[in-house]
């Protein structure tokens, strides 16, 4: 089993992560992990802080001579924008955890809350997910994401319906990670407009896991279902308010005959011509791509603040402003990729086990051979 913990505050000295359960002898490609961190920092609509920070990991343990040892991997990412003694937040922001967190932990204001609830913490999650991606790519499993909507602007249905795996490598060409050039222009305009008006924008992310083997997850108990684990991990990303798999919410208005993926058999075994289920049935991966969409709300920190109440005076006032993004949807898509990577890596280790990568690979290959006999 793979598990992790993170620690650190947004304006503290740095972030700390501990990742346990990665088998020994996995090549640690530091450039790959640092590139994942760089991808998270990019995107139109980010705050000035992205020009300050240059996220790179420092490995303290669990790696020797570029290979994992099987011991817990401890990671540090330093903060350059450090100032933990910033002014107290007594004017809580609607939509953020300032008020509820301060009341729960008996703080005078929301400073201690926002320092930890900040999306800055997701930098460490991306580093951890990056290591999980290294494990997955050894089994030819890859994870992609792209943006299908920001604000009211959606990519065209024609382009969306014709996206293939080769297209998914091209999202880096877009500053907002969309595969529709016309939509990209409109999105950039909407982000500029929101910034000018002191407002923020949300959107919809699509994340796709490819070459997923049959049999990850389980139908035997509620807490072992793969889609449940994925939903939990994606919903834990700051600002994410909903998730769907495959056709998702649109299935509510369709007939069963229009929704379920018919099963066929050919030279390569069982297959489906459609993937309306999004690659998971009864909590188990079915061999198709895993396709999920997540909805991100607009960021709650506004330059034109909403009404709130001062926690000291109890008088009506305007919410406090902190340096923040106008739109973080492109960045959130990278976080979502790496959260999916964590879940899938955990499931791979759970199913194919082994203390070393070599042992895990043998178990995986034996499983594929067994499946071939059933084809």
Task: Put a short name on every predicted segment.
Residues 1-375:
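Generic N-terminal targeting/processing segments that precede catalytic cores or assembly contacts
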């Amino acid at each position: 089993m793979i598990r992790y913990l993170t620690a650190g505050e947004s304006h503290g000295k740095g972030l700390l992560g501990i990742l346990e359960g990665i088998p020994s002898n996995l090549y640690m490609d530091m450039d790959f992990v640092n590139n994942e961190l760089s991808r998270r920092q990019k995107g139109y609509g980010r705050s000035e802080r992205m020009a300050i920070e240059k996220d790179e990991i420092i490995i303290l343990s669990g790696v020797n001579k570029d290979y994992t040892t099987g011991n817990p991997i401890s990671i540090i990412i330093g903060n350059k924008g450090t100032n933990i003694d910033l002014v107290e937040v007594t004017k809580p922001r609607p939509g953020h955890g300032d008020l509820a967190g301060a009341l729960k932990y008996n703080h005078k204001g929301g400073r201690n809350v926002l320092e930890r609830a900040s999306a800055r913490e997701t930098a460490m999650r991306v580093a951890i997910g990056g290591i999980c991606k290294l494990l997955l790519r050894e089994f030819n499993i890859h994870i992609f994401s792209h943006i299908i909507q920001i604000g009211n602007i959606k990519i065209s249905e024609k382009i969306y319906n014709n996206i293939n795996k080769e297209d998914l490598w091209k999202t880096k060409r877009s500053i907002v990670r969309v595969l529709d050039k016309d939509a990209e222009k409109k999105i950039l305009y909407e982000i500029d407009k929101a910034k000018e008006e002191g407002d923020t924008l949300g959107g919809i992310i699509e994340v796709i896991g490819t070459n997923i083997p049959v049999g990850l997850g389980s139908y035997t108990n509620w807490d072992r279902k793969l889609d449940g684990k994925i939903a939990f991990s994606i919903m834990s990303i700051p600002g994410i308010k909903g998730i769907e798999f495959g056709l998702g919410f649109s299935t509510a208005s369709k007939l069963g005959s229009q929704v379920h993926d018919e099963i066929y058999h050919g030279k390569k075994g069982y297959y489906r011509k459609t993937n309306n289920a999004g690659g998971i049935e009864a909590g188990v991966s079915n061999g198709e791509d895993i396709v999920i969409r997540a909805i991100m709300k607009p960021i709650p920190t506004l330059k034109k603040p909403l009404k709130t109440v001062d926690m000291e005076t109890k008088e009506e006032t305007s919410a406090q402003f902190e340096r923040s993004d106008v739109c973080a949807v492109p960045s959130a898509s990278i976080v979502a990729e790496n959260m999916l990577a964590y879940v899938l890596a955990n499931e791979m280790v759970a199913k194919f086990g082994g203390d070393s990568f070599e042992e895990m690979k043998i178990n995986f290959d034996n499983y594929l051979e067994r499946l071939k006999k059933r084809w």
